[in-house]
């Protein structure tokens, strides 16, 4: 998303995110780090995770798990897109990618003069992009604006997404990331 938090160093964002504990509201750094972790894993994420956890992160394994859970082959078990969970005809049906929810979240970005980076191939309602926008709102706008966005968008679908991810029996990295993300979205309405 430009301009926004993607220019943060991944290692700093990951470190800040997971040092952010307690009952207070999540920081912009926490939202940004979560966004980085929900994207297709790359060497920068691997290096940041390895530096912050003092463990070896197997990038190939992380990429394979990301692909299994969120990409395919075949139909993705847990697509990380809002429209898939909100734009189906019935609660049990998955909706289309690039549905009406995609357009609604894109209007939020546009209202603040933001748009996904040109290099971004995922739809604007990808969980990582929504979390990145939450980081922007936390840093540049009031808590009320952030709360409105979270209520209208990620909180409206992340529980359905979380159930599908859990049903797919994710490896520890994605199970933990999912739990931290759900907790972060729940805590975000804590006053600044």
Curated annotation (Swiss-Prot):
The keyword Chaperone applies. Disruption phenotype: Cells lacking this gene fail to grow under anaerobic conditions using either DMSO or TMAO as terminal electron acceptors. SUPFAM superfamilies: TorD-like. InterPro entries: DMSO/NO3_reduct_chaperone, TorD-like_sf, TorD/DmsD_chaperones. Pfam families: Nitrate_red_del (PF02613). Induction: By anaerobic conditions. Its expression is under the control of DmsR. Keywords: Chaperone. It comes from the Archaea. May be involved in the biogenesis/assembly of dimethyl sulfoxide (DMSO) reductase. Belongs to the TorD/DmsD family. This is Putative dimethyl sulfoxide reductase chaperone.
